[in-house]
Amino acid sequence: MFSIYNIMQYILLLTFVATVLSQSNLRGNSDLSAVVGDQVFEWKEFSNFQERFSKKYSSLEEMEERFSVFRENFRAIRQHNNDLSQNFTMGINQFTDLTPAEFKATYVSGLKAAPLQASGCKSFSSGASSAPETVDWRLHNAVTPVKDQGQCGSCWTFSASGAMEGAWSISKGSLVSLSEQELVDCAGLKYGSMGCNGGQMDGAFKYAIDNGMCTETAYPYTSGVTKTAGTCHSCSAVDHFSSCSDVKANDQLSLKAAVAQQPVSIAISADTKYFQSYSSGVLTSSSCYTSLDHGVLTVGYGSENGQKYWLVKNSWGTSWGDQGYVKIARSDSTNDPGICGIAMQPSFPSV
């Protein structure tokens, strides 16, 4: 039997096709068939999208609005992927029914633009002359599975926890998933944090230096659903950190040297349609800007088809990007913010 939701979908499809036919000035049956075929194909993709990501809309009007947004994004994805000069592909993901403004407000507004003042982190710089050609910390049990921040501006906590997880694993030989919720709830204004309204990775490191960090199991993440911070409560810290370091700004050789030692927190610009729909390949200069708005984790670097890249772990789940990861173009510049601003604010903790 059809559900009410199935009937809504069917009504909207019929309405949509009828509108196309009534407004069409096409001169032949072949042209008409092509247009209707494209519209039906887009609707099928939208239906598959709803099923894949468990999307439910409250009314026919909302479904129509979301289909319109999906269709615009889907057309942009197809147009991009048909351009053989591009170094990366785009694809349908959980954000394809969101406008750029909606995407920005919910998923790329969790990083404070200015660095935390007087964070207490040391300075780090190096020529990276002895760094290996490729690094992937996932292969050395220093990276936990991709997580999902949900509808909370807590990217900074996932970036910071990932860097701390890596540092602890490399130092102690044990990979432990740490609590982002502890940082959301407990690292307040003293550490430059406003919970789901943003924060800085350096502030998270300073909190961990002062208090230690609890495990994900002991203090599980809930703000992705509640969309707000909870009440800070005590837990038994299992990982402790002694200091943090800020990598020399705009110096990709120093960043390379740091990543050769351990995963490194970075801030990037993610407020573009390219990042919203990124699927695979290497993001390049035309793809994003340098207005920092999102915290992520660099877990390695390498090259692909002659293009150097940084390997970056995101916090939007495995449905986004390349199983939750993105490759961002890399260079050997020592005076350049890098693609998406990747070299502007790198930092890492020490055990």
Regions found by a protein language model. Name each.
Residues M1-I11:
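Positively charged n-region of N-terminal signal peptides that target proteins for export
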Residues Q9-V351:
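Catalytic-core signature of thiol
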